């Protein structure tokens, strides 16, 4: 339990964190990786280079300071981060290392006096304990459910399927021949990739793109532009070098962006680009479980060449009367225009959504590039969709949709 004095001191640093938060977290990661380079086997190098991880951590530290007198308020965020930590294999012993480096960064960047550093040291201990406790429960649950396991387990790529010019699916089965644990539609797994010539292991999280209850997991990966770009290194390796029969270490499914199976409301699945992957898991689950809920599947792509899984979605729409699918192409090809195989040219807008979705009393799920997600969030706000009915997932560190 933190003293009133400690809480007061930590809360007094909120303006400082607002002003220098990213500077502090940038310095923190420099210290962390300089003194503990082995942790580069866990953290996503791309998010480091782009500054996304630094921003996400700055946001988390700022929230912790703001709500230090009411940490219950940030438990949902702690759980969301906890899912990623469990998926990556972050353990209790990592927290003291992080705490030491964070306090050093606060001192170096802000010139914080000992009184502030001591207060933050106490506060960090309480926050770390919350993470450790929640993540311990997650490790237990993942390991002890049927077909479950702890940390990483080797999976064989039994099938590799090209879904579009830029997206390929990988079907994964356990190398040990055992069962795979079930998951909730919308969840992801972490895969480990060791690229020849690279010093450190690359971890990447990919949404599971099929319904649970199969003998395999399926991930569907977008090939990012440029082999030498941070984004493209792993995705190009998967597309170009990983083949059927290869083995990849995989973590148990994780994540809190999940389909609410208890709701009876209609379901609206809105995706942009590779954001279609968790939506496919949700769609397939709804039809396989014979749900009678109306489903509106809205997808945005550049054109038919980059539009993955369109034949499957069309087949589902044709077979199940409760499913309606709509496609928006930002730059349709001449063939697309000739075939009229899409519903709207340009971008998804609130006025168009109003014409294809008859009610705002529905569960709305969306995923895609950050700019797309900001646009969709604004559109749903325009339509006065209730906040509790809006669900979304970032591919990478969380950011603001405002």
Curated annotation (Swiss-Prot):
The record marks 84, 393 as: Influences the redox potential of the prosthetic heme and FAD groups. Consists of two distinct domains; an N-terminal heme-containing oxygen-binding domain and a C-terminal reductase domain with binding sites for FAD and NAD(P)H. FAD binds at residues 188, 204-207, 394-397. The record marks 29 as: Involved in heme-bound ligand stabilization and O-O bond activation. The lineage of its organism: Bacteria, Bacillati, Bacillota, Bacilli, Bacillales. InterPro entries: Cbr1-like_FAD-bd_dom, FAD-bd_FR_type, FNR_nucleotide-bd, Globin, Globin-like_sf, Globin/Proto, Hmp, OxRdtase_FAD/NAD-bd. It comes from Bacillus cereus (strain ATCC 14579 / DSM 31 / CCUG 7414 / JCM 2152 / NBRC 15305 / NCIMB 9373 / NCTC 2599 / NRRL B-3711). Its EC number is 1.14.12.17. Binds 1 heme b (iron(II)-protoporphyrin IX) group per subunit. Residues 1-136 form the Globin domain. This is Flavohemoprotein. Pfam families: FAD_binding_6, Globin, NAD_binding_1. One of its GO terms (cellular component) is cytoplasm. It catalyses: 2 nitric oxide + NADPH + 2 O2 = 2 nitrate + NADP(+) + H(+); 2 nitric oxide + NADH + 2 O2 = 2 nitrate + NAD(+) + H(+).
């Amino acid at each position: 339990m933190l003293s009133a004095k400690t809480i007061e001191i930590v809360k007094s640093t909120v303006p400082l964190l607002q002003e220098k938060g990213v500077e502090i977290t940038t310095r923190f990661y420099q210290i962390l990786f300089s003194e503990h380079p082995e942790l580069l086997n866990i953290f996503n190098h791309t998010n480091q280079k782009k500054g996304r991880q630094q921003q996400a951590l700055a946001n988390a530290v700022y929230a912790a300071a703001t709500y230090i007198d009411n940490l219950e308020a940030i438990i949902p965020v702690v759980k969301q981060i906890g899912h990623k930590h469990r998926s990556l294999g972050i353990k209790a012993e990592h927290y003291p290392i992080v705490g030491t480096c964070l306090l050093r960064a606060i001192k170096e960047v802000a010139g914080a006096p000992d009184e502030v550093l001591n207060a933050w040291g106490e506060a960090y201990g309480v926050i770390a304990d919350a993470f450790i406790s929640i993540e311990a429960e997650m490790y237990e649950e993942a390991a002890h459910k049927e077909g479950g396991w702890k940390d990483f387990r080797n999976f064989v790529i039994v099938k590799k399927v090209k879904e579009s010019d830029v997206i390929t699916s990988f079907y994964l089965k356990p190398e040990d021949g055992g069962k795979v644990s079930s998951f909730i539609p919308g969840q992801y797994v972490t895969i480990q990739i060791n690229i020849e010539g690279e010093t450190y292991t690359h971890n990447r999280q990919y949404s599971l793109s099929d319904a649970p209850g199969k003998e395999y997991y399926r991930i569907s990966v977008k090939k990012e532009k440029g082999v030498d770009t941070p984004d493209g290194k792993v995705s190009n390796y998967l597309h170009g070098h990983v083949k059927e029969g290869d083995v990849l270490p995989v973590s148990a499914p994780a994540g809190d962006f999940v389909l609410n199976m208890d709701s009876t409301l209609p379901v609206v699945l809105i995706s942009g680009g590779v954001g279609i992957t968790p939506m496919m898991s949700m769609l397939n689950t709804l039809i396989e479980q014979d749900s009678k809920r109306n489903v509106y599947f809205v997808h945005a792509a550049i054109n038919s060449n980059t539009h993955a899984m369109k034949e499957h979605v069309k087949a589902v729409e044709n077979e199940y009367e409760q499913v309606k699918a709509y496609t928006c192409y930002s730059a349709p090809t001449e063939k697309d225009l000739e075939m009229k195989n899409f519903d709207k040219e340009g971008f998804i807008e609130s006025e168009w959504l109003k014409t294809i979705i008859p009610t705002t009393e529905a569960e709305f799920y969306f995923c895609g590039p950050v700019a797309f997600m900001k646009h969709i969030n604004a559109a749903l706000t325009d339509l006065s969709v209730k906040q509790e009915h809006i669900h979304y997932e970032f591919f990478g560190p969380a950011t603001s949709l405002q």
